[in-house]
Structure formats: structure tokens, C-alpha cells
Amino acid sequence: MTEVELWSRETRAQRACAALVKNGFDAVYVKTAEEAADLVMQFVKPGMKLGFGGSMTIKTLGIQDKATQAGAQVLDHNKPGLGAEEKLDILRSQLTCDVFICSANAVTMKGEMLNIDGNGNRVAALTFGPKKNVVV
């Protein structure tokens, strides 16, 4: 990526972040994946119950593993070997967790987040339930 392309992306990201703040979100721009993971982990404390929306971004950042290592209780509805009823119980329990962590499908330059969901747990958690939501 050229220096101009990098500057353009960073400028757009900062403008979108400012628009999110204008719309009432607590939004922070970070430059690197490592900074993003570190910022998310500031919300994770030992013993907390954490829910996760299905997110390749969160998976790539290694947040679930880091949260487990930090002593948090990870409510993982994608854990191998779960039966349908067990998975549904975990999805429901994510609605009352301490922190729900997910990513947005898109963020507009007007400061709007777009979220589409297969199970409904991410959209439900973003609108009602968890004590705090962290969206990457």
C-alpha cells in the first residue's frame, strides 16, 4: 500500500470515528491490530462473563483466547461438540453477560453501524442485555 493510500484510509477511518462519536458512540481509532486487541482487552477482567458475535475480526485478533487466558468466562456458542439445545442456552446467556464483543459488518461515514446476523445473537445483544458492548 502506498503512503497516499494509507493516509487516505486513515483519514476516512478517523472521520467515520468522529461521526460515530457525534452520534453518541464511544469510538476510538487505532492503527494496528495489536492496538485494537489491547484496547478490547482493557474491558476484560477475570471472572467476567463474555459473549461473542461470530466475527472473523475478533477471531483474527485472538480475543477469545486472550480473554480465557485473562481468567474471563467465555460463552462460546461455536464450541465443538455442542448440541443444539446447549448452543441455544449459550446464545441466550450471552444476552446477560458482562461484556459482549463483536464486529460491525460496516460503518458509514455518517457514523452509522450496519449489522446483519445469522443467529440473531449479535443484533439482540447490541440492542438489549449485556452490561457493555464492544464493537471492533
PLM feature spans:
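The feature marks the mature, well-folded catalytic cores of soluble enzymes
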Residues: 1-136
